[in-house]
Amino acid sequence: MKAGHLLWALLLMHSLWSIPTDGAIRNYYLGIQDMQWNYAPKGRNVITNQTLNNDTVASSFLKSGKNRIGSSYKKTVYKEYSDGTYTEEIAKPAWLGFLGPLLQAEVGDVILIHLKNFASRPYTIHPHGVFYEKDSEGSLYPDGSSGYLKADDSVPPGGSHVYNWSIPESHAPTEADPACLTWIYHSHVDAPRDIATGLIGPLITCKRGTLDGNSPPQRKDVDHNFFLLFSVIDENLSWHLDDNIATYCSDPASVDKEDGAFQDSNRMHAINGFVFGNLPELSMCAQKHVAWHLFGMGNEIDVHTAFFHGQMLSIRGHHTDVANIFPATFVTAEMVPQKSGTWLISCEVNSHLRSGMQAFYKVDSCSMDPPVDQLTGKVRQYFIQAHEIQWDYGPIGYDGRTGKSLREPGSGPDKYFQKSSSRIGGTYWKVRYEAFQDETFQERVHQEEETHLGILGPVIRAEVGDTIQVVFYNRASQPFSIQPHGVFYEKNSEGTVYNDGTSHPKVAKSFEKVTYYWTVPPHAGPTAQDPACLTWMYFSAADPTRDTNSGLVGPLLVCKAGALGADGKQKGVDKEFFLLFTVFDENESWYNNANQAAGMLDSRLLSEDVEGFQDSNRMHAINGFLFSNLPRLDMCKGDTVAWHLLGLGTETDVHGVMFEGNTVQLQGMRKGAVMLFPHTFVTAIMQPDNPGIFEIYCQAGSHREEGMQAIYNVSQCSSHQDSPRQHYQASRVYYIMAEEIEWDYCPDRSWELEWHNTSEKDSYGHVFLSNKDGLLGSKYKKAVFREYTDGTFRIPRPRSGPEEHLGILGPLIRGEVGDILTVVFKNKASRPYSIHAHGVLESNTGGPQAAEPGEVLTYQWNIPERSGPGPSDSACVSWIYYSAVDPIKDMYSGLVGPLVICRNGILEPNGGRNDMDREFALLFLIFDENQSWYLKENIATYGPQESSHVNLKDATFLESNKMHAINGKLYANLRGLTVYQGERVAWYMLAMGQDTDIHTVHFHAESFLYQNGQSYRADVVDLFPGTFEVVEMVASNPGTWLMHCHVTDHVHAGMETIFTVLSHEEHFSTMTTITKEIGKAVILRDIGGDNVKMLGMNIPIKDVEILSSALIAICVLLLLIALALGGVVWYQHRQRKLRRNRRSILDDSFKLLSLKQ
């Protein structure tokens, strides 16, 4: 026996010993099957209890016809079977719909998926949240693997594959996470189309001891476990579209698959594949623990706010009654239902609500006595009236920021404020909630500090333990109501109309009064992790879409006991501001006809420009004001300011609320922007340290351009004592130049074409990358920030190694709290540019000075405490810098870069972090080249010879210039994302852009931690315009892996790249060293004679071979005995596990044998 043999025996023992012995092997037999699916099996709108003949909206989706498919579609789904014969299907709860079966495991477990494809095309199964190697990833893309490692990437019809997943500690729920984390699995050959076809299911990974030993296992810690997928399922993307047209359309030949109305009819706004309340009832017992596992999937329109009427949820330690869900977002919510009855779950995005994304859940008393709320506080009375008014969106008549008239032709605002025979102008009939002193409704309540509320109703305030009594008087011409968030109420005080088996006296008809009673028991108020007061909203829900667009919405504040003073205001806060960000769609208002009549519009002109007219009625407002017409928000330097921010509207109402000049804290995390979605509410705290006049605006480029701006003023007040001045020290200087270059978004198409196994013309990327048929291709002239070694700007700092991945981005600028960052900027471009940074304290309060072509300017950025990490943040936070001469056009031209600010002591002298081994900054942005300063030059350079023939408004041309990029690269053309196994990696994830820049970024094979007061586990990070996130990872899984945005259109458009985890070079050198040392121990000769020094003794050479063989034999024998004993222990332990697992591999093997005999 050679010495090396002993080494390999030792390594074998190590590998066997490393197999998890404390967890179960959980076998799942899944078959992929075609089936017929009905989105509305009850054949009606269950929410309103209307037939399809009486519901024009529901019938537009659900009635089949000459060129309409209707409610039934062929789909392909995962089904579970009892064993490898795939003959006995295991039933699942009806409410799971077309979702695959629940897969569940604990930390330490192994999941074996025995997948067989009974369908007509290749599919796979790819998981989130678990560990897998290359042969079990289930995702098709060029990753450098081959042979058996590719068998999992595409299981052909009739084929099968066994996927091996595990849940090691590196993928375990953290201490702060709930007992079980929500994940999904889905097919990943062409993931968007596979998922739209139906191949998706739920997966949970749990902490040890959470699951019992039953088959299937049940959770010990909850009484009910529900899984809900919120998705606009696009049947136009299904692999079965042609089959569905042929089967369900009465005249298939008449179908135009490109017709917009036909495509809309195939987009099913579903919960688990059911629409308009057709989801089978979700039943639970009051006062029992319920786990809700919520997840989303889909496209840019898949922005969902799930509202649970009547109950309160707990998500990551915070109380809420809504959950925000996006494509590949996973939410675990906990509930202990208190109020029995049939309650509504709905997506509160207006278009989704109207299109049927609603379901019921039923809370039964289950013989339990109803809980007695501990209400020891006040009864707070509010007298609120709905009053019709004429509302002016621009009362001062000019843009408060620029001073230009709102009606100046070509100014931008004139689109909304110029009155003509085809435009209403800026004044509309609306309805508003107004506060009165008592039930006589004679004397209004006037409070000077609430003048900024604008169209909003009065602020309703309460503390834990209080009862709120609202007397509502409807003096409007339509039935209206008041529906609250964030409080408890009985059925007779709910303001939403739906078919729950009760009457609805709480919708007030015209000139009718109704009274609502809401309560704030302890289990509904702010938690220990919440701020002192939580921001909520109330609104009319007789017809939620039309009521709120008409103006009926107001703020509600729920505080901890003792947080409100005698005057009803929050203690410890100097200023409170309530801001609603929404696009008021006056086309959806109850008063649309009245407004058109009042405007004396010409119907002929309207019919010629319907789209333009409707667009002019969509008012991008803050509290009902556009273009900085909101009454100015005044505060003093050093004040504690509470910003109560509210969102409302439809899927385009994705708002990144930016506070120019100062930063805010959100749950202890430092932010420059706060994200709002329909029916989401945020409390942000600011302590302004930067006097001046600043903007509040929505970061989504189009929203800001369309007027979603306001002004706040920070004054140096004599009554305020200055806080101790922060000490700064000059420390870091960057030399940055703006230069114009040719940029290629996709220099190599081989990855893209191999991925899709297609030609250039048939690839999804053709529209973006082809330079034929009037398109520009992948090359564009751009301006970029580049770093130089010194102020001569002669020697560029090379981009290699750690900075190779930056791509189009400028250099990664780093600083610590207390630093002064000096940026020497030279503009070598052909037009004026500047450098403006988020988060820092800029020395020039009027905004950064622009550098003319050839000019050199120096910018100074101070880094105060409020620019660095908050108490709940990671050690570093990410920001962004860009040219701000024209922020939108400058950024799309290419001038953008990352900025990182760290706590003191984190950065090394060379700028790197001492707590991380690698840092990567990634910008996910749809570069809209149509808005670049260089569009005309690019058309002339890269377009057709007759560039004057290019139609700049052509839809295909416009789409072709929208580059769905990661650091300016498409289809895995970004280079430099390489780490070694075991390294600590910080990812600075950045997003800017428009409301379509919703990016849910998924890391294959790795999970990461993100900070939100505590550490939480995830493998998808959500990004929106103006959000900058930091996630941290310990790279654990060697291989080349995919990273991509999970939004359907973004996947196909190329927003994906690969990152590589390499094994440590030390692994090989260590093994080599061990081998050499063993060899030395066996054959090392004594220098002076014919003996060998071995085991401390001089042994004659002639006896060495015999002794060596004997020693090795003894070692091997002892090793075998140890292995045998260990194997017996392991076998007994495993047998106990397997006896509790009826689907074990051994049992199934015997079943198969008996069937064959």
UniProtKB/Swiss-Prot annotation:
Its main location: membrane. Cu(2+) 2 binds at residues 128, 186, 1046. It is found in: Basolateral cell membrane. Residues 24-206, 218-366, 370-559, 569-717, 730-902, 910-1066 form the Plastocyanin-like domain. Na(+) 3 binds at residues 768, 777. It is a single-pass type I membrane protein. Glycans are attached at residues 49, 54, 164, 236, 587, 713, 757, 930. One of its GO terms (cellular component) is basolateral plasma membrane. Belongs to the multicopper oxidase family. This is Hephaestin. The gene is Heph.
